[in-house]
A protein has these predicted regions:
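Mid-domain Rossmann-like dinucleotide-binding core that forms the NAD(H)/NADP(H) cofactor-binding site
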Residues: 2-81
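Short conserved AdoMet
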Residues: 97, 110, 189, 193
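Glycine- and other small-residue-rich loops at beta-strand/loop junctions that grip anionic moieties
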Residues: 39, 60-61, 93-94, 118-120, ...
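A general structural signal for well-ordered alpha-helical segments in protein cores
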Residues: 9, 16-19, 43, 89, ...
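Glycine-rich phosphate-binding loop and adjacent beta-alpha segment
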Residues: 99-161, 201-204
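A short acidic, Gly/Pro-enriched loop at the edge of an enzyme's catalytic core
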Residues: 84-92
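C-terminal hydrophobic helical "lid"/dimerization subdomain
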Residues: 149-204
Length: 204
């Protein structure tokens, strides 16, 4: 939609749509407790959509304190550098791809809880799973790679409705014209921003 800033709209077909798919697999989050592992753009999108879906409590975990702080405007009730061993959640969504985080998410689930793994998109060491605990605690593990058409539609609708509530546009920390694509890549490598925008055309 025209009223959505380019910077926010640019997040739709990656982080926001993938997050919509993760929430689809997670099921009804209303009044639930949700753990989000990883506070990159995907983790922030998951937190924001869980918040908009009515989750009662959203905890975001990331080893980076600055990323934890960034999660708070996206609906996180708390953000920590490690999982609190005293807390339990109905849903744990891993956006990090780190085996240790996925294991921590399983340990943090309530009986009957659901783990959704989204971040493991590259080859990595296997994740040891305690089958007895999965069986006794009635756990569900679901994986998602990319998103479907319905997820993309929901991502567009979410962004139209909530782009002023959750500051996705602020994640695009630099903007370059298409003619300066090499400079955009160089800037991204040198500074490590959340996102770098490349404008296919500049506003009239």
């Amino acid at each position: 939609a025209d009223h959505v800033p380019d910077e926010a709209a640019a997040m739709i077909n990656c982080a926001i749509a993938t997050a919509a798919g993760a929430l689809r697999l997670a099921g009804d989050l209303s009044q639930g407790r949700v753990l989000v592992l990883g506070a990159g753009a995907l983790g922030l999108a998951v937190a924001a959509q869980a918040h908009a879906a009515g989750a009662a409590h959203i905890a975001v975990v990331d080893p980076s304190p600055s990323r934890c702080e960034r999660a708070l405007p996206f609906g996180a009730a708390c953000a920590r550098t490690a999982v609190d061993p005293e807390q339990r959640y109905e849903v744990a969504i891993d956006c990090s791809g780190a085996p240790a985080a996925m294991r921590a998410g399983l340990r943090a689930l309530e009986v009957g809880g659901t783990a959704v793994w989204v971040g493991a998109v590259l080859p990595q060491p296997p994740v040891p799973v305690d089958a007895e605990q999965v069986v006794r605690r009635l756990l569900t593990i679901r994986g998602l790679h990319n998103y479907d058409t319905g997820d993309l539609v929901r991502a567009v609708q979410f962004t139209e409705a909530h782009h002023r509530t959750y500051p996705f546009a602020e994640l695009v920390q630099a903007r370059f014209p298409l003619a300066d694509l090499d400079a955009a890549f160089a800037h991204a490598l040198a500074t490590g921003p959340w996102r770098v925008g490349v404008a296919l055309r500049e506003p009239d």
